[in-house]
């Protein structure tokens, strides 16, 4: 047998020797009030999932069953979701989804100071308990489908000590990401974090090669790198500190996302979204209602698991002639719609829409009640909101700007506290669990 074949890394051994760490402590400040009470990875998405379900499902589908989720900001709903929806792995076989909340292990006066510090503060557990050969580090707040085992194979085959996932993005958007340049072997030759003037790809003046915030490390090199950047004058961040270090050491390689993207549509397009703003969150949800969306959430070959609410079937009641009904929308379980119009929208579980109301291009989170004769257009309605009879949202943006929050692209966010203030009620009366 060919020696090159004999020396190829074994996928089963690689995933068995790998620990996954999902960074899920971020607040998501650009989502404003939508993440006031929940971490960004715990935010609802696609009718009956949460954002973190994509990273977790990618792990399970890739054969990676040793997972730690690092949490910090507003973690209660995220921890409950992990406990109720992701506790099915058999621990007797060494498989788990463990929760690693911020516990101020190194310094009693500080929480995690950055993405790299969140891993550094858990090194005692990682080294002493998990003892991995490789560590895969993921952001818990992106929407995509990816076979991480392919990235692991590429990492080992290249001889890298650190591999970063990358994707081609429009140059004007690249200032929000780490941007790199690579040679013909995919060795990274330059890396800059969130540049104001992103460098273009060779031969593609309008595109940049952006970091996806996905990293594979040889465990020993990760420990060494984290120890080297723990000085007070660093940002304790993978993009700002660890990537430049690996670049200078000559051990940093790139993994193009199109090598491991799963669930492409009929046109072969790849899909990866950072839903870090109100506009991108709204758009990513609305994208799902098209006939052939770029992201196929119905694909059973690469399923996105979660913890769907056990609800009764949704009910649609129409007894008025010429009443426009429901078209091009996603409707989760437990919804009640009576003589109302819904188009190009996403309704999460247990939403009620009363007679005469119209919903267009909107994202309605769980347990929202919409009164009679309401008009909702291009808006995001947060969980538990009760829209009073006759209210119009998204129709007069000048009026909405005095009551709610309006995004750069004119999407209106409505939360329970905003309506309470509008009605003169005490915001402190809110006591819902997310």
From Swiss-Prot:
Gene3D superfamilies: Hexapeptide repeat proteins, Spore Coat Polysaccharide Biosynthesis Protein SpsA, Chain A. Alpha-D-glucose 1-phosphate binds at residues 112, 178, 193-194, 211. It catalyses: alpha-D-glucose 1-phosphate + ATP + H(+) = ADP-alpha-D-glucose + diphosphate. Keywords: ATP-binding, Carbohydrate metabolism, Glycogen biosynthesis, Glycogen metabolism, Nucleotide-binding, Nucleotidyltransferase, Transferase. The keyword RNA-binding does not apply. Pathway: Glycan biosynthesis; glycogen biosynthesis. It holds the Pfam family Hexapep_GlmU. PROSITE patterns: ADP_GLC_PYROPHOSPH_1 (PS00808), ADP_GLC_PYROPHOSPH_2 (PS00809), ADP_GLC_PYROPHOSPH_3 (PS00810). It comes from the Bacteria. GO terms for molecular function: ATP binding; glucose-1-phosphate adenylyltransferase activity. SUPFAM superfamilies: Nucleotide-diphospho-sugar transferases, Trimeric LpxA-like enzymes. It is an enzyme of class 2 (transferase). GO terms for biological process: glycogen biosynthetic process. Its EC number is 2.7.7.27. NCBIfam families: glgC, PRK00725.1, PRK00844.1. Homotetramer. Belongs to the bacterial/plant glucose-1-phosphate adenylyltransferase family. Involved in the biosynthesis of ADP-glucose, a building block required for the elongation reactions to produce glycogen. Catalyzes the reaction between ATP and alpha-D-glucose 1-phosphate (G1P) to produce pyrophosphate and ADP-Glc. PANTHER family: GLUCOSE-1-PHOSPHATE ADENYLYLTRANSFERASE, GLUCOSE-1-PHOSPHATE ADENYLYLTRANSFERASE-RELATED. This is Glucose-1-phosphate adenylyltransferase. It comes from Mannheimia succiniciproducens (strain KCTC 0769BP / MBEL55E). The gene is glgC.
